[in-house]
Amino acid sequence: VGDGQPGGLPDILIRGSNSVTQSNAPLYVVDGIPLESPDNSSIPTQNIKSIEILKDASATAIYGARGANGVIVITTDSGSKGAPKINFEYRYSLSKDYNRYEMMSPYEFVRLQNELDAAYGSMYLDGRDPHPDGTPWTLDDYKNVRPIDWQDEISQLGQMHEYSVSASGGTEKTTYMASFNYANQKGIILNTGMKNYVGSMNITQKIGNRMQLVMRANYAEKERTGMQVNYGQGSSAYMYKVWSYRPISTNGVDLTHELEDPERPESGVPMFNPLLQTQNTDQKYITRQLRTSAMFNWNILKCLKFTTSISYTSTESQTDIFNNSKTEAGSTLPGRNDGINGSRRVTRTNNVLNENTLNFNKKFDNIHDLAVTVGCTQQKNVSDIFEAKAT
């Protein structure tokens, strides 16, 4: 499940909603690196070799409490023996919003306002300037008035361009896989978009007949711009403001150019123009992530295997927001805000993980199986946050 905004992450549930206050998202393990809050766009689908879902006791047996919501194990392609192969892909896609809510016509809207509150609803009849011939407005006159469909005003045809190039090959001892991916998306909401860059390199080296070294590196950078539709409150939070804005103007007022509904304050509930809000939103969300890992496998005996790995993950998230005078947050309307303002927030996280396992697996007399696993894990996680605001 996702909110459909450019670069938005899907909400995946494996074992249902086990908690009301905590995250129900599964643990991701990408090439042996546990990631509790991964950006899926940093893992191009073209590079995925296999996906395994752990949803029973095995998830907690291996990953402890982190696997309580299930585990998604992703392994990326490491290349294969053979002559070098170059692959290039280009994809172009279009997106459009469907299943829109059917909005009230001007006639239906005015009739409802009069039924709910005759005093407030009268501004569309007695309170409106008369026709050029001096006759007052009647309810039936609104049957010929063209409505403002704010869903049309704030939307556009979404487009996405995706480019992917990869090189792979290898010998009996060494295999490799290198790739670069770029995506550029224009969202279905005005002034929204996303750019995504991903580069990765995987090398597998056999050492003798019993040992293997696997090295992986991945760098991803994603930039999202424009209105973020969920605000952490659900995908409809932004659209509620669009659906609730009145579809008609009165007395020559062009609602599409007014930041605040000039009639709405009389009812005690301020309403802000969703079109101007969308057009003037200046928000940028940048995520940069570097993942590196090395894994050493040693088949000591036919029934005994030792594996050790070390990984380093560095993640930086940057949020830049500027609210100008044509936005709700930057307006100087009485009782609203302090005017134009801006902010920057940067979060950096560095994670180092070392895992060591010794596996014994042997079958006795073709009847009995004995499997024993001994492991040791060390992990260090350091985070820091910087934030600045100005008005």
List each model region and its residues.
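Short, small/polar-rich motifs associated with maturation and membrane association
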Residues: 1-200, 205-220, 291-292
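Surface-exposed loop/interface segments of Gram-negative outer-membrane beta-barrel transport/assembly proteins
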Residues: 80-146, 187-192, 198, 202-291, ...
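Functionally critical loop-and-helix segments that line ligand-binding/catalytic clefts
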Residues: 299
